[in-house]
Amino acid sequence: MVISGERAYIYAKICGIIGKSFVGKRVSALGGINRLAELDRIVFPNANRDLPERELLPDLERRTAEKIVREIIGIIKCFKEPPEFLILLIRAYEYADMKAVLSALADRETMSPSWTDIGEFRTVNFEAYPNIEKMLKGTEFEFLLKEDMTDTLSLQTKLDRRYYGAVWNAVLKLPRGDRKGIEKIIGDEISLRNAAWVLRLRTYYNMKPEKIKNMLIFIEGKKTFTDDSLEALNFALDVRSEWTKWKWAAFVREGNIGEYWKIDPRYFQNQASAFLYRSVYHSFKTRPFTLDSVFCFVRLKQSEEDVITSIAEGFGFNITARESLTLLGAI
């Protein structure tokens, strides 16, 4: 494979960032932390935030997100012509922020929810909240203005479908040599999101199968990524043996003899996230100089954000850093 100077420079740059990030073996360094202030000092050694913990938590989460977004954008800007796929990765933050806006509007909140600044890649005028027409004018999100703004769950599903549909189509436009790992990981990610959603809706909301089907991320084409989740609609939630031959059975909690068993959506979600993390880390190590490695860099940084946030929020529930990492499957 002929490696361009641009690709070599970008790969060297992302390796330098990853080497200083809390991913891979460095995640375990967070396990011995006991206090939020200590976590803040490790993540931001040059910062001196003398804040009460209830103020430090949102402050730490905000700075963590801002730092990681800056690093991701810095890499994307290294491309003379960034692929559409990479731009969509950073715009995931905008989609997530739009979900928060829709929830806030449905609850008639007058103050805007916090949002992540993705710089030149941002399209929504979040400063105009709560004027939704002004916020969305000229953006791809204008279609929301014709929807029932009170049906938050349906709107969020439409956003998920729109986002992952755009991502998948952008992946298929990449050269085959660049997308080997991306295609597999994104496909698994969509499939697992659907599966986790089915488990949550069945377990926590007792939602009927026909309604659940309308809440899944369905992508037009040869691969719909709904087969596994549709199959899970038919399994009894309290019979472990019915799940044994399911594609994602390894992520379903085992039961003990004589113990009442029921599907655990949170356990499934954590196991699925750990599986995707391992896939991303392996691909990052084995696919240097490809867009695969850049994609994996983005996912590793986003995983780092999730880990830091989970540990920080866990302290508020008397959950230790090590316990949080164990729940996430990070150690």
Which residue ranges define each predicted feature?
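N-terminal domain-start signal
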Residues: 1-331
